[in-house]
Each structure stands twice: as structure tokens, then as C-alpha cells.
């Protein structure tokens, strides 16, 4: 940020009265016409496309994007989202529309850690691994904000700082207790990277308390860690109405004035909600100083200046027009992202891909076969066209193949029609299966039953999941259809891990499509018939039930995620198949011993031994040999996505930065010396292996020079 921007912000704020300053700290900020400051609504969403503001390109949900492991793709998507946001903002502003969701401060990405598969909002995240989350979060932020240090294309926001991942039902009163080790090893890592590597403009505080302090008013989180330790220079915004929780649910204050003052005094600059309507009263009572308020407003003015909202400080992006919204190129990128996000979990005897010449009749069965909700997740925009799996198969196969359809059952209820008897669509599904050559079962969830408290419709769990089984009658429907004896392909639509133990044993192929975006059905159909090879990898662990998981409210990382669990799992983190095989050899490093401040370069030859072009995700894992017992086992520390043509070999280089060798031994982050094992893998050889199966293994020693 330039000195000019900082001085301009100070000049603007110095001319404001105390009431005017406070007015700018509310998410609905009024105009100050005498200073040339237009009205502005800070609340805008862009989790996987511009959301809630009309037509936009709807990309796969964040968890699906995470399955690509591809930072270049995610940054490109962020840039497209920002371009569409700019196009909308520019035209809305010309027409005097400054309403909610029409601005440029996007409250995304969500870089919380998906530590427990029951969390309803996990599909908003990039999965369970801090390294992957940090990499992808930074990529999306760079795409949204652009590369001009003094002119923001849009402003990103890393949320929810910092220890936040359910339960949804008690988020307004819950105290998440986390050890210093888990804080720095897991919960803070991605936020730190977003601040230091991507220069994220905003950070949103969470609803819950963290070790006794409400996150939106925590001196430890917002001042000691975020600003002093991480060097954050942007603004902090509260989650919506979270500051009221201070006195209403957390009981750390007695009045709304005390709550507003606590938030500002500890580093919260902007209030999504109503608490700061009482900030003047808090000021009059001496609970908060003019200096604290001024500092907050200066930070808010800095971002508005950098976004080009002041007439004396124009934006280089102000000529982007509405024509870019959902244009052909953007739609094509969304479909490509859907293709890249699909994870092939099972392919018995290379059953897939199908040969369309051999399929005369195909049955598409299940509550998600023709569901738009199963395409889009939450925090979505409006697409001008949706393509469900049913529609994708119909369009792909044309008139030459008959496509039969049956809903089979409701997503979670025992009947589809209210006056009917239970299982009212079962028999139709069985008839369709009997008449087909192959069956595509489209099962899973959607954001009406896994999502955010207050948004998701499952009032029994406030958006969270009670277990990992398919809901309602879906499992029973799957078993009944499979019993017909026709080949079955299961296409899963969900934003989280599902226990597919029965399906793993009994169906021919399984594809996880996540929530693949508005036109994701096109990608599903193309994958089934071999137009491309699926290449996605799981960004989460698929467990066999929840019986061996810790309590949902337990924020210790012990026995959680691939980094700390010792349990047998159904599909491990990083797992995903191709059509055909890729093989690795020639693993080497540029040095067997290195100074702690030096990067290490790792090389491996990767060969595509198939007739399909593949986007191979090369994964590098590190394990510290002499690590403390509370340290993770193997953990992801390197990713390289390489496109390989049929039968092509490429030499791939992965660079491990010095910090990737660090262990968290609070308050230090370095051991004086250690030996680390490096493993490079495409995917575990078998779904039930706990650590990605290494092609080969190398030890690397490094020394910490004091």
C-alpha cells in the first residue's frame, strides 16, 4: 500500500465527526457527501462465484475446487469471479444501486479446517489439511485481489478467524478450547499464509469463543497474533451479529455498549450487525477512545480508496462491463473446474469408462439425478442454465441411447409425495433398472441438509450431520437397485465424507462429484463415457462411521484427520483413481543435508501409462523421524499438478521451503536438528491404507544454525 493511500485515508478521517466515523464502521455505511464518500454495503459473497447478486458463473463448491489441488486453476477462478464482481459493481453503481451483495468486499474464502466430517459448513472450506488450505486460499485471494499493490480488483476476506468448525447449533455460545500446539499446527496456519503470502485485505472473526475469549473481541487473536505476530495490515470484520453474542450468549460483557467497545478495543474494525449502533454511547461512557475508532476507520477508508470508490482515486478496473458476467469463457472454465474436481473412488475391473456404442438404455436414478440444489452448494449465484447429471447424460447421448429416469426416493424423507405411502418411488426405480443396460445412481446430500445454522433445513442438527450414512431411504434404495443385477455406477453429490462401505463392496464404480457447479452434470456425463479421465483427489478423509471419532465439540486434533488418526479408513486423504495408471521413478533430492534456511528441491519422473490425457497431482509428504509424540505423522508439504499426454513422461520438480520442515514446538517453530522422510505419491495403492503409499522414500537431514 502506498504512502499516498495511507495519507489520503488519514485526511478523510480527520475531517469526520465522531458520529460520521462510527457510521462508517457499520456494514451498511452511509454516504458522507461533503467528503465525497459514497454509501457502501460491505456485505458481499463470492465463495465459488459472485453470490446473491443475480446471474453469475457458478463454479464448483469450494470443497470440490479443493479436490483439484491446483493453485493455478483456483487463482484463475478467483480472477474470473473478481472480473464478474467488477462488471456488476460498475454497472450497479452507475444506476445508484449500492445495496447488499452489490459491492467488492467479498467475504471469502473460508479457510477453516474441516476437522470433523459432521460439520455442516465443511463444504465451504478447502478440506482438512492446513497446507492445502493455505495454498488454495492464497491462490483464490490472489485471483480476487489482483497483483496491483495499490489498486484492488476486489477485496478478499479470510474467515472465520480462527478456531471454528462447529457444532453449528451452539456456535453463538460455544468455547472452542485448543492447545497452543493445535492452534499453530492446525487452526492458524492457513490464516498466517493468507496474511503473509497473499496479503489478504480482510479477516472475519468467528462467532464462538476461543480459549475463553470471543473471537470477534479477542485481544489474543486479533492483536497479539493477527496484527503483532502475523503483521496483518487490513481490516477485521465481525461475523454477522456476532458481537451481540458477547453479552447475550458468551456473557463476557453485560451490555451492548460494553460489547461494542470490547470489539473495537481489541481490533475489530467493521460490524456486520447492529452492535456498533451503540458505539457512540460506549464512547460517551468512556468505554472506547476516539483513537481506537479513528484507527479502525482509517483502515476501512484505505480499502475503499484502493478499490477506487473515491472520486479523486479512480480504479484501473472501472471500465469492466457487465458483458463479462457468465460469458462463454467463464462458463467453459466452470465446466473444466467441475471435470478437474471429480474423484474416481472405485472402478472395479476398469468398468469405466462406458462405451456408448454398447449402451442402448441407461437408467439414471436417485434424488440428486435431476436436482439443481445438488449442483450448487451454498453461497451461490444464479446461473442462466443448469445441467444436472440426468440432463448431462441426455445431452451427451442424444437420441441414439434411451435415458430412463426415476427419482427413487426423497433426499431424506420416507416419501416423495406427501399423501403417498412410504417408499412411493421405489418400484418405479426398480422397473427402470430392470429395463436398462447400466444404472447411474445419483445419491448424497445437498446444502438444504448440510450447511450453516439458520440456512440449512435440517432443524434437528442446525446444518450439521448426525452421522455419515446416506440420509433417509437412499442406502436402502441403492441396495434394492443393485439387487436387480445390472451394473451400477454411484455418483455421489455431497460436500463432505459419506460412509460408502456398502457401495465399495457392491457397486461397479463410484464417482464423487461434490457440488460441481451449475453445469456440473455435463462433466459427470463426459467422465462416465471417457471424454476425459477423472483426476481429483480427496481433500478429506472418508471414515467408516463416526464411532471412533472424538466428540464433535472436542477441538483437540488427536485422532482427527489423516495427520493424526490411527484408524482404518475407507478412503484416505489424497486418494483418487485415474482411467489407467501413472507411474513414478527416479526420486531424488538436490541435497541430502541442508541449512534450515535453505529450500530443498525434490525430483521425480512421472509417466502416464494410459491412452488418456491426465492431470496428475503429485503429492509430497514429510514425516519427522524424531518428532514429538504429539506431532503429525506424514503431512502434505508439496503439490505439483502436471498435465501428461498419453504415454508421456515428465520430470517433475517440487520445492520444499524451510518452513515446511518446521515443527510446532510452542513457542518455537524449529527444532535444532531433525531427520525427515519424504514420500512422493500419486494416490494410495489401496483405499484402506493409512498413509499414501510411497513409490520410494528418501531421508533428508537439516541443521538449525543458531
Language-model features: where?
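Conserved small/polar residues in nucleotide/adenosyl-binding loops
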Residues: 703-706
Amino acid at each position: 500500500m502506498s504512502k499516498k493511500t495511507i495519507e489520503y485515508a488519514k485526511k478523510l478521517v480527520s475531517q469526520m465527526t465522531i458520529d460520521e466515523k462510527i457510521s462508517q464502521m457499520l456494514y451498511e455505511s452511509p454516504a458522507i457527501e461533503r467528503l465525497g464518500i459514497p454509501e457502501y454495503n460491505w456485505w458481499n459473497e463470492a465463495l465459488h462465484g459472485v453470490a446473491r447478486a443475480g446471474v453469475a458463473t457458478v463454479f464448483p463448491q469450494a470443497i470440490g475446487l479443493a479436490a483439484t489441488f491446483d493453485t493455478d486453476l483456483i487463482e484463475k477462478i478467483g480472477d474470473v469471479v473478481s472480473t464478474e464482481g467488477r462488471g456488476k459493481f460498475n454497472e450497479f453503481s452507475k444506476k445508484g444501486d449500492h445495496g447488499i451483495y452489490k459491492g467488492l468486499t467479498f467475504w471469502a474464502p473460508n479457510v477453516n479446517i474441516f476437522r470433523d466430517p459432521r460439520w455442516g459448513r465443511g463444504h465451504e472450506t478447502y478440506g482438512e489439511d492446513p497446507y492445502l488450505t493455505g495454498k488454495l486460499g492464497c491462490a483464490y485471494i490472489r485471483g480476487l485481489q489482483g497483483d496491483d499493490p495499490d489498486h484492488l480488483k476486489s477485496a478478499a476476506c479470510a474467515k472465520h478467524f480462527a478456531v471454528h468448525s462447529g457444532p453449528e447449533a451452539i456456535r453463538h455460545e460455544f468455547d472452542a478450547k485448543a492447545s497452543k500446539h493445535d492452534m499453530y499446527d492446525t487452526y492458524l496456519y492457513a490464516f498466517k499464509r493468507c496474511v503473509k503470502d497473499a496479503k489478504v485485505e480482510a479477516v472475519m472473526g468467528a462467532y464462538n469463543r476461543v480459549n475463553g475469549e470471543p473471537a470477534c473481541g479477542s485481544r489474543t487473536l486479533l492483536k497479539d497474533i493477527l496484527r503483532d505476530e502475523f503483521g496483518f495490515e487490513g481490516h477485521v470484520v465481525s461475523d454477522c451479529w456476532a458481537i451481540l453474542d458477547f453479552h447475550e450468549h458468551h456473557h463476557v460483557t453485560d451490555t451492548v455498549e460494553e460489547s461494542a467497545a470490547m470489539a473495537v478495543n481489541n481490533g475489530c474494525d467493521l460490524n456486520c450487525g447492529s452492535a456498533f449502533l451503540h458505539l457512540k454511547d460506549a464512547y460517551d461512557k468512556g468505554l472506547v477512545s476516539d483513537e481506537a475508532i479513528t484507527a479502525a476507520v482509517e483502515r476501512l477508508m484505505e480499502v475503499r480508496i484502493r478499490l477506487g470508490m473515491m472520486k479523486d482515486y479512480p480504479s484501473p478496473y472501472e471500465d469492466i462491463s457487465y458483458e463479462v458476467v457468465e460469458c462463454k469463457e467463464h462458463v467453459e472454465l466452470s465446466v473444466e473446474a467441475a471435470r478437474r474436481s471429480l474423484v474416481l473412488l472405485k472402478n472395479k475391473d476398469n468398468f469405466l469408462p462406458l462405451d456408448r456404442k454398447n449402451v442402448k438404455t441407461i437408467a439414471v436414478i436417485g434424488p440428486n439425478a435431476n436436482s439443481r440444489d445438488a449442483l450448487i452448494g451454498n453461497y451461490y449465484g444464479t446461473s442462466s442454465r443448469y445441467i444436472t447429471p440426468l440432463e448431462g447424460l441426455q445431452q451427451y447421448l442424444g437420441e441414439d441411447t434411451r435415458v430412463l429416469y426415476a427419482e427413487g426416493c426423497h433426499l431424506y424423507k420416507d416419501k416423495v409425495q406427501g399423501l403417498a405411502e412410504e417408499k412411493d418411488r421405489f418400484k418405479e426405480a426398480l422397473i427402470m433398472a430392470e429395463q436398462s443396460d447400466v444404472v447411474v445412481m445419483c445419491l448424497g446430500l445437498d446444502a438444504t441438509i448440510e450447511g450453516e445454522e439458520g440456512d440449512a433445513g435440517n432443524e434437528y442438527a442446525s446444518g450439521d450431520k448426525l452421522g455419515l450414512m446416506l440420509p433417509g431411504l437412499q442406502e436402502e434404495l441403492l441396495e434394492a437397485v443393485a439387487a436387480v443385477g445390472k451394473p451400477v455406477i454411484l455418483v455421489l453429490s455431497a460436500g463432505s465424507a459419506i460412509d460408502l462401505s456398502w457401495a465399495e463392496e457392491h457397486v461397479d464404480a463410484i464417482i464423487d462429484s461434490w457440488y460441481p457447479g451449475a453445469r456440473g452434470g455435463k462433466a459427470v456425463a463426459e467422465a462416465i463415457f471417457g471424454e476425459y479421465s477423472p483426476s481429483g483427489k480427496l481433500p478429506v478423509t472418508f471414515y467408516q462411521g463416526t464411532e471412533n471419532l472424538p466428540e464433535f465439540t472436542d477441538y483437540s486434533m488427536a485422532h482427527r484427520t489423516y495427520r493424526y488418526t490411527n484408524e482404518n479408513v475407507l478412503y484416505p486423504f489424497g486418494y483418487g483413481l485415474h482411467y489407467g495408471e501413472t507411474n513414478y521413478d527416479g526420486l531424488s533430492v538436490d541435497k541430502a543435508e541442508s541449512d534450515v534456511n535453505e529450500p530443498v528441491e525434490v525430483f521425480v519422473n512421472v509417466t502416464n501409462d494410459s491412452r488418456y490425457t491426465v492431470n496428475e497431482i503429485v503429492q509430497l509428504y514429510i514425516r519427522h523421524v524424531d518428532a514429538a509424540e504429539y506431532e503429525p505423522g506424514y503431512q502434505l508439504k508439496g503439490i505439483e499438478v502436471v498435465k501428461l499426454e498419453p504415454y508421456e513422461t515428465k520430470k517433475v520438480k517440487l520445492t520444499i521451503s524451510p518452513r515446511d520442515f518446521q515443527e510446532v514446538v510452542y513457542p518455537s517453530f524449529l527444532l535444532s536438528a531433525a531427520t525427515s522422510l519424504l514420500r512422493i505419491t500419486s494416490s494410495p495403492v489401496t483405499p484402506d491404507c493409512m498413509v499414501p503409499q510411497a513409490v520410494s522414500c528418501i531421508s533428508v537431514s537439516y541443521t538449525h544454525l543458531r
